């Protein structure tokens, strides 16, 4: 059983402030695993929200899970 989720992408500026350009797409759970493997670190903030940061590209990926 796979879980669908929305992928939210925004870039962060060099001094740490965030400006938002949102790109929403739908995926299945297997894509989530491959996405996590490609980034350097990720952390869970809420049970339905995961923030994944790719430090090399200074992008932040927010994955919102849909039960």
Curated annotation (Swiss-Prot):
Name used for this protein in its record: Uncharacterized protein ORF67b
Source organism of this protein record: Acidianus filamentous virus 2 (isolate Italy/Pozzuoli)
Domain of life, source organism: Viruses
């Amino acid at each position: 059983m796979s879980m669908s989720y929305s992928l939210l992408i925004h870039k962060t500026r060099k001094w740490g402030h965030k400006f938002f350009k949102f790109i929403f797409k739908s995926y299945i759970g297997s894509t989530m695993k491959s996405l996590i493997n490609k980034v350097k670190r990720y952390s869970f903030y809420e049970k339905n929200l995961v923030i994944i940061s790719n430090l090399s590209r200074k992008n932040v990926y927010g994955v919102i899970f849909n039960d």
